[in-house]
């Protein structure tokens, strides 16, 4: 086992991720706000890992209004991709600028070892897709954004997903027409942001019958939460849970801190904590110990052919 990189090379991870998107069963991608969460997602048996721009911003105590940089996003994506054999899909916002910036974004994220990214049709700087007051660029501007990203791609298995926020701005029919244009520009998958109801998802799938579609099941937003089974029955190929793990973690942290402040001890939380032994197991402490022991006892000519 290589302790400091993946057990599966990036080319095979991308192939497997693309195959999962085309499989009969929906690919479920929980969001990871850290490499350790990504490893937990893999051990839980999911089909992929999602890295949310909103979560990267929140982890830096910033709002999701386009304040993070390509450097910050690529750095976190690389950290996460390093520790999991699953394909990682990254939120690349608007591509961090003009079409040439979108092209550079794809190059940087390919170098980071992820399986794909999505680009959106909001103006730059953007805002959270479930907030009011969003603005979208003209369709031809987003088409150039997608075309630039596709032209910069070196690995044909790197997935380029086009996200449209137009449903909440121009209406669902306009979003459908945009999706068709983005597919014509070379997008591999369409992310339909902030649809409201199951009926909306069915309507969108009926209008775009053959393309890969991704659904966003984020909490406390504009979208009714649908199960993976329902989305699969509708015909969606992937579903993300972008902020779920962060919200669970932060909810628990805030409750625990309040109790510690009130009672002066964390003892009441011990049965709700991850045990030290489980953390060590997740971190693969024993593998590091074996590696260290081998190096410590290394002798020239012994087991080093």
UniProtKB/Swiss-Prot annotation:
PROSITE patterns reported for this sequence: ISOCITRATE_LYASE
Cofactor: Mg(2+)
Residues annotated for Mg(2+) binding in this entry: 91, 93
Residues the record lists as binding substrate: 52-54, 128-129, 163, 193, 216-218, 247, 276
Keyword Transmembrane in record: no
Coiled coil segments of this chain: none
Keywords attached to this entry: Lyase, Magnesium, Metal-binding
EC number: 4.1.3.30
GO process terms (BP): propionate catabolic process, 2-methylcitrate cycle
One Gene Ontology term of the molecular function aspect: methylisocitrate lyase activity
Pfam families assigned to the protein according to its UniProt record, in alphabetical order: PEP_mutase (PF13714)
InterPro entries: ICL/PEPM (IPR039556), Isocitrate_lyase_ph_CS (IPR018523), PrpB (IPR012695), Pyrv/PenolPyrv_kinase-like_dom (IPR015813), Pyrv_kinase-like_dom_sf (IPR040442)
Record's catalysed reaction(s): (2S,3R)-3-hydroxybutane-1,2,3-tricarboxylate = pyruvate + succinate
Subunit structure: Homotetramer; dimer of dimers.
Family per similarity comment: Belongs to the isocitrate lyase/PEP mutase superfamily. Methylisocitrate lyase family.
Misc remark: The prpD1B1C1 operon seems not to be involved in propionate degradation.
Function: Catalyzes the thermodynamically favored C-C bond cleavage of (2R,3S)-2-methylisocitrate to yield pyruvate and succinate via an alpha-carboxy-carbanion intermediate.
The protein's name in its UniProt record: Probable 2-methylisocitrate lyase 1
Lineage: Bacteria, Bacillati, Actinomycetota, Actinomycetes, Mycobacteriales
């Amino acid at each position: 086992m290589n302790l400091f990189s993946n057990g599966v090379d990036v080319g095979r991870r991308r192939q497997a991720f693309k195959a999962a998107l085309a499989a009969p069963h929906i690919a479920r991608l929980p969001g990871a706000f850290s490499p350790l969460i990504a490893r937990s997602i893999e051990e839980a048996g999911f089909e992929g890992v999602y890295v949310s721009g909103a979560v990267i911003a929140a982890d830096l105590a910033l709002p999701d209004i386009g304040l993070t940089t390509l450097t910050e996003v690529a750095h976190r994506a690389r950290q996460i991709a390093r520790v999991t054999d699953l394909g990682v899909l990254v939120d690349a916002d608007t591509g961090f600028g003009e079409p040439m910036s979108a092209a550079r974004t794809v190059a940087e994220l390919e170098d980071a070892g992820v399986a794909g990214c999505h680009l959106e049709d909001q103006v730059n700087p953007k805002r959270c897709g479930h907030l009011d007051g969003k603005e979208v660029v003209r369709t031809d501007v987003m088409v150039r954004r997608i075309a630039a990203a596709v032209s910069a791609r070196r690995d044909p298995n790197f997935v380029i997903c086009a996200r449209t926020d137009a449903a909440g701005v121009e209406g669902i029919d306009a979003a459908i027409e945009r999706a068709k244009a983005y597919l014509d520009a070379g997008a591999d998958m369409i992310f339909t942001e902030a649809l409201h109801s199951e009926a909306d998802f069915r309507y969108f799938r009926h209008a775009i019958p053959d393309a890969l579609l991704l659904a966003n099941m984020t909490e406390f937003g504009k979208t009714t939460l649908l199960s993976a089974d329902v989305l699969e029955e509708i015909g969606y190929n992937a579903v993300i849970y972008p902020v779920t793990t962060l919200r669970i973690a932060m909810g628990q942290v805030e409750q625990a801190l309040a109790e510690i402040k009130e009672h002066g001890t964390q003892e009441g939380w011990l049965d709700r904590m991850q045990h030290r032994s489980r953390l060590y197991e997740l971190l693969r402490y024993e593998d590091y110990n074996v590696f260290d022991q081998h190096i410590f006892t290394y002798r020239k000519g012994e087991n080093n052919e």
